[in-house]
Amino acid sequence: SDVYKRQLSRDMVKAAADSKDYSVSDTVNSEDYTIVKTEGDTAYIALDFLQKYANFDYEVYKDPARVVITSKFGERQMAKVKDDSQVRILGGVKSPVLEEVKKGDKLTVLEDVSDWKKVCTKSGIVGYIQKSKLKDAKKETISREFEEPDYTGIKKDYKINLVWHQVTSEAANEGIEDALAATKGLNTISPTWFSVTDNSGNISSIASTDYVDYAHQCGLEVWALVDNFDQNVDDMELLSHTSSRENLENQLVNAALQNGIDGINVDFEQIPTDVGDHYIQFIRELSVLCRVNNLVLSVDNYVPKGYNTHYHREEQGVMADYVIIMGYDEHFAGSYEAGSVASYNYVKEGIEETLRDVPADKVINAVPFLSLIHISEPTRLQLIS
């Protein structure tokens, strides 16, 4: 995309390529330098501009040309150089010299290696120096004044008891009364109302204000679900462009506000690995619009496994109000062996692994109200129910 976009808690920062202008929500501002430069498919963003919205320090050095960026602050082990010495590629006096250091220079100590210490110089060179060449080793606190965005969203003061409601047509919305008649204890319902229909971020909607009104009368909030199940939609094309993401986000929020919906539930499945960064940017941007418009944002996730880390659960836990584990499909119709839809250990692992990344008060575990009956034969496995 030809637009740099950075989300704050309740604002969006946008800067067009090769321009000195940028906007914070609806307010246009200018800098005395070009904010984003492009060369072919590569974009370069001015570090001074980034420093307005991200917590880091930087210094530029020559010979060789490099930028040293400090983004982690807090305690560091430091030491001073006793006398003029050298930082080398490896431990050992025969190892090539990377940088000459002067008496009194401060070095960051990264680790001890026998008689040598791995250090980082002020100019960003990482190498090794003899322990005997250092003195005054002590911990120092490195800090920078910066106010982190407050991503506090909506937190209900009750446990969420949610059910997804499979709705496939506008007429099917009339079934809510029968669907709720035999239930008790629910406080949230998520109808399958929105689907992404093309790569430009347009959606189809079967939302119903009558449905929402009835749910509210029954004491339920409505978190409308949006899916990416249309096979004609290319997730990369949809999510890697600012314009299509923005269109999708605006359409979802507008539809929610027009129908009195309380929240949006994102059910994007089978996201390719290389689309993960674009997907989480979509979640970030959608979270801002939801926060401003008092809409609950929840995101559906698989049970954590190595192959789905690109869904960025930890970042979801910052941006979204609730992270929902789809705690099922341990075995399914296409499985090579018969087994539980959601065994105890499978569900337990899903919750525990999610809690490593997401605050407990944001986690919802979804359980399946279904069983699968398999027939196992010597040459095949058949699902019959």
Please place each PLM-identified region on the residue numbering.
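Short acidic catalytic loops
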Residues: 190-195, 256-271
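Primary recognition of N-terminal secretory signal peptides and signal-anchoring hydrophobic helices
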Residues: 1-113, 135, 143-151
